[in-house]
C-alpha cells in the first residue's frame, strides 16, 4: 500500500491539472490530458502489482472468503472517477438524447389539415376541397423573418413568393444570438434583391455584445429580436385580416400554399405550416418534422413568435432547408452564432475538411443523436441521412437557375471554403 501511495503522489499533479481543465472547459487540452492520465494510471497499476508480486511467497491454498482489501477499492475509484468525469463531460448530451424516450414525453399531436393542390385547378375548386370558400379579392400577405446570413436561401424564398407578398419584412442584427459582432449581410447585399425593391421593409436591431470570455444567453437575445419584429410589422402597415407568415429564413412556404391562404375564406385564424425538412441541400430529405412556421390572420393581439401556438397544422406546405449554405465558412458562422452554439463541444468541430466530409455523407455536424421520443424512431434515424436523386417539387426559381445553385441539388455536395 505504501508503494501505491508513493506512485499516486508522483502522478497527483497530473490529476489535479486535469480536474482544473474540466472546470475551466479548456476542451482541446482536456483530450491531450486524458491520454496522459491513462498512461499514468497504467504505470501506477503496473508498479503496484509488480511490487505485490515480488513480495508474494508460496502459501497453502485456502478456500475461505476474504473481503476485497480497501486498497483495491482505492485503485478502482482512482480509475473510475476521472474516466466518469471525462465521459459525462464529453458524451453527456449524447447519453441524455439516447435515453430521452425514458425521461421525456412527446408534445400533444397536431391535428393535421389535408392539403390539396394540382396545377391548372381553379382556386374556387381548391378552396371547396378544404371546406373553405373563395374570396372575391385576395388578402394582403406579409412575410416576416429575422435574418442572419442565409443570402442564397433568402433569394430563393423571395423569388418563390414575390408575386404574392405585399411586404417582405426583414429584421437583422449587428450581433449573433450568442452576442458576437457580425456584419449586416442583407444591408451590404441589397442590390441582389433589387427585384423586390418597393416591397422590402428592413431594419437593424442593435444587439448586445457579450463581454470578453463570456456569452450572452442566446435564447434571451433571440426573444428580444422577435419582440422588435412586432414594432416593425406595424411600421410596414399590416392591418386586421391580412395574412402574416412567421418563419425562419430557411423555412420556405410554397407559393401555392400562400395563394391558397390568400384567396380562401374560412381558414383558421392561426395554423402551423408543415414543411419537408432537408439538411445541407435538397439532396438529403430528413422527414416532415418541421412545424414551427405559422400563418396568421392578423389582429391587434397577434405577436411574432416561433413556438407552438395552435394544434392545427397544414400538411406539406413548403420546405425547410437547414444549413443549406454555399461556402464552408458560412457553416462555421452558423455553428458558432445560433441559439444552440453550445453543441460545438470541440474546436475540431469547425475544421473545414471535417465539415465538408459530413456534408457529403449527410451526417450530423455536432455528432449528436436524433431528438426523438421513441426508441423505434431514434434507431430509425441514427446514422447518415440517405441521399435522394429527386429534384421534383422544389422551388421553381431553384430549378430555373440550377447552374447557379448546383450545391443545393443532388450530386452537388462539394462546397467552396469562402
Predicted regions and their residues:
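Juxtamembrane luminal stem/stalk of type II transmembrane Golgi/ER carbohydrate-processing enzymes
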Residues: 3-4, 8, 28-141, 380-418
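C-terminal accessory extensions appended to soluble enzyme cores
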Residues: 61-65, 313-418
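Active-site beta-to-alpha loop of glycosyltransferases that engages the nucleotide-sugar donor
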Residues: 138, 142-159, 163, 173-175
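Structural motif
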Residues: 140-142, 167, 243
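Short, acidic, metal-binding catalytic loop of nucleotide-sugar glycosyltransferases
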Residues: 157-167, 171-175, 183-187, 192
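Active-site-proximal specificity loops/subdomain of glycosyltransferases
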Residues: 176-242
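Short beta-strand-to-loop acidic/aromatic patch adjacent to the donor-nucleotide binding site
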Residues: 240-252
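Conserved catalytic core of nucleotide-sugar-dependent glycosyltransferases
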Residues: 251-351, 355-356
Amino acid at each position: 500500500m505504501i508503494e501505491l501511495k508513493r506512485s499516486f503522489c508522483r502522478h497527483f499533479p497530473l490529476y489535479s491539472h486535469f480536474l482544473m481543465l474540466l472546470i475551466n472547459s479548456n476542451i482541446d487540452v482536456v483530450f491531450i490530458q486524458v491520454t496522459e492520465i491513462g498512461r499514468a494510471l497504467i504505470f501506477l497499476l503496473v508498479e503496484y502489482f509488480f511490487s505485490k508480486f515480488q513480495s508474494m511467497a508460496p502459501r497453502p491454498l485456502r478456500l475461505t472468503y476474504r473481503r476485497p482489501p480497501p486498497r483495491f477499492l482505492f485503485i478502482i475509484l482512482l480509475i473510475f472517477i476521472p474516466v466518469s468525469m471525462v465521459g459525462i463531460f464529453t458524451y453527456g448530451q449524447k447519453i441524455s438524447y439516447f435515453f430521452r424516450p425514458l425521461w421525456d414525453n412527446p408534445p400533444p399531436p397536431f391535428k393535421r389539415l389535408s392539403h390539396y393542390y394540382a396545377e391548372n385547378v381553379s382556386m374556387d375548386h381548391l378552396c371547396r376541397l378544404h371546406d373553405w370558400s373563395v374570396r372575391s379579392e385576395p388578402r394582403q400577405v406579409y412575410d416576416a423573418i429575422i435574418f442572419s446570413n442565409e443570402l442564397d436561401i433568402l433569394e430563393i424564398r423571395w423569388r418563390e413568393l414575390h408575386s404574392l407578398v405585399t411586404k417582405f419584412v426583414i429584421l437583422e442584427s449587428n450581433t449573433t444570438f450568442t452576442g458576437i459582432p457580425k456584419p449586416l449581410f442583407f444591408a451590404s447585399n441589397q442590390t441582389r434583391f433589387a427585384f423586390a425593391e418597393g416591397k422590402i421593409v428592413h431594419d437593424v436591431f442593435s444587439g448586445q455584445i457579450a463581454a470578453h470570455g463570456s456569452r450572452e444567453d442566446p435564447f434571451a437575445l433571440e426573444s428580444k429580436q422577435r419582440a422588435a419584429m412586432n414594432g416593425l410589422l406595424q411600421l410596414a402597415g399590416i392591418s386586421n385580416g391580412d395574412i402574416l407568415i412567421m418563419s425562419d429564413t430557411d423555412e420556405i412556404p410554397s407559393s401555392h400554399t400562400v395563394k391558397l391562404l390568400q384567396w380562401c375564406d374560412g381558414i383558421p385564424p392561426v395554423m402551423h405550416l408543415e414543411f419537408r425538412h432537408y439538411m445541407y441541400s435538397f439532396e438529403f430529405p430528413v422527414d416532415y418534422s418541421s412545424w414551427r412556421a405559422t400563418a396568421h390572420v392578423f389582429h391587434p393581439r397577434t405577436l411574432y413568435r416561433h413556438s407552438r401556438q395552435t394544434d392545427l397544422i397544414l400538411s406539406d406546405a413548403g420546405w425547410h432547408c437547414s444549413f443549406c449554405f454555399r461556402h464552408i465558412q458560412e457553416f462555421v458562422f452558423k455553428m458558432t452564432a445560433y441559439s444552440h452554439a453550445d453543441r460545438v463541444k470541440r474546436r475540431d468541430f469547425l475544421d473545414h475538411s471535417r465539415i465538408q466530409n459530413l456534408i457529403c455523407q449527410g451526417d450530423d455536424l455536432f455528432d449528436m443523436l436524433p431528438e426523438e421520443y421513441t426508441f423505434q424512431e431514434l434507431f430509425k434515424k441514427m446514422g447518415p441521412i440517405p441521399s435522394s436523386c429527386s429534384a421534383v417539387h422544389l422551388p421553381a426559381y431553384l430549378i430555373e437557375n440550377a447552374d447557379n445553385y448546383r450545391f443545393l441539388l443532388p450530386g452537388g455536395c462539394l462546397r467552396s471554403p469562402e
